């Protein structure tokens, strides 16, 4: 597996920055062009196939895209930055200007989307609104290694948090995340995270998920999460 990962890493390096339509940033670009390129990267939807996606990931993606045709499922787009509206919504809860300088905030990016193609978190989430559940297809790249050849548990926890969060809506925060890691996840493999909203109790959303291999034979993790809808009357800081 390590050997195949090394080969994967080599081909990933060969593909660096070649996500279809992705601008290449280099130091010799003129400032105006650099700014334009950066804008394109920020507004790009990253939950779409790129050359680093394995056959398994592409196949599952195509299957779920078919399910989207009758409107029962939808693919959730994913950006490096939250929309201006979403950011404004969250800002109302974090009013203290000393907390994060505005300038720093303008550089902020969703950290799962901060890696080059194939090296970090490659994922797409599909949502079934009627059934209050989502399916996240996730391929963890070589920069997410923990124990040699295996995905870091923190990387898995991050994806579980995002997958559970995708079953919620509006301004929520993770209050509790409980994960049972049952089997280690091979680096560069594809896993499927099935998440659902189990119960809504006032501002509390109780969610659960499982993480399985593509053939569904291996159960890697099970998790539950408590998310809290933020109270507009309270500042969280
Ligand atoms: C397109 C979209 C796709 C999705 C992708 C998204 C991408 C981004 C994804 C990024 C994802 C990033 C995600 C992240 O990284 S979120 C970052 C990690 N999370 C935090 O930093 C949260 C820190 N905590 C807080 O801010 C507050 O504690 C919150 C806001 C959570 C609640 O403070 P608030 O003052 O508002 O509420 P309350 O204290 O009155 O409590 C209310 C009720 O809740 C119950 N309670 C509270 N805590 C717990 C607990 N631990 N276990 C059990 N119960 C708990 C409490 O008993 C009470 O119950 P009841 O008495 O009413 O019965």
Curated annotation (Swiss-Prot):
GO cellular component: cytosol; mitochondrial inner membrane; mitochondrial intermembrane space; mitochondrion; ruffle membrane
A Pfam family that the UniProt record links to this protein: 4HBT
Main location: membrane
Active site: 161 (proton donor/acceptor)
Top-level taxon of the source organism: Eukaryota
Record keywords: Apoptosis, Cell membrane, Cell projection, Cytoplasm, Fatty acid metabolism, Hydrolase, Lipid metabolism, Membrane, Mitochondrion, Mitochondrion inner membrane, Phosphoprotein, Transit peptide
UniProt-listed GO biological process terms: fatty acid metabolic process; negative regulation of phosphatidylinositol 3-kinase/protein kinase B signal transduction; regulation of mitochondrial membrane permeability involved in apoptotic process
Function comment: Has acyl-CoA thioesterase activity towards medium and long-chain (C14 to C18) fatty acyl-CoA substrates, and probably plays a role in mitochondrial fatty acid metabolism. Plays a role in the apoptotic process, possibly via its regulation of AKT1 activity.
PANTHER family: ACYL-COENZYME A THIOESTERASE THEM4
Name of the protein this chain belongs to: Acyl-coenzyme A thioesterase THEM4
Organism (species): Bos taurus
């Amino acid at each position: 597996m390590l050997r195949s990962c090394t080969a994967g890493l080599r081909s990933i390096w060969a593909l660096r920055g070649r996500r279809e339509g992705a601008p290449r940033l280099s130091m010799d670009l003129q400032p105006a062009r650099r700014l334009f390129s950066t804008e394109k990267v920020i507004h790009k939807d990253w939950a779409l196939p790129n050359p680093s996606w394995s056959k398994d990931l592409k196949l599952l993606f195509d299957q779920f895209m078919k399910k989207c045709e009758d409107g029962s499922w939808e693919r959730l787009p994913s950006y490096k930055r939250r929309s201006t509206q979403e950011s404004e919504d969250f800002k109302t809860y974090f009013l203290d200007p000393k907390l994060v300088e505005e300038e720093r905030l303008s550089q902020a990016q969703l950290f799962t989307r901060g890696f080059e193609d194939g090296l970090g978190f490659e994922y797409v989430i599909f949502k079934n609104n009627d059934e209050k559940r989502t399916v996240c297809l996730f391929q963890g790249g070589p920069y997410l290694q923990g124990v040699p050849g295996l995905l870091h548990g923190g990387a898995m926890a991050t994806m579980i948090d995002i997958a559970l969060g995708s079953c919620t809506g509006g301004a929520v925060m993770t209050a509790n995340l409980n994960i049972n890691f049952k089997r280690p996840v091979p680096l560069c493999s594809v896993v499927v995270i099935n998440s659902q909203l189990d119960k809504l109790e006032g501002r509390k959303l109780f969610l659960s998920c499982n993480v399985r291999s593509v053939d569904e034979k291996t159960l890697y993790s099970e998790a539950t999460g408590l998310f809290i809808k933020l109270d507009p009357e309270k500042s969280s800081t």
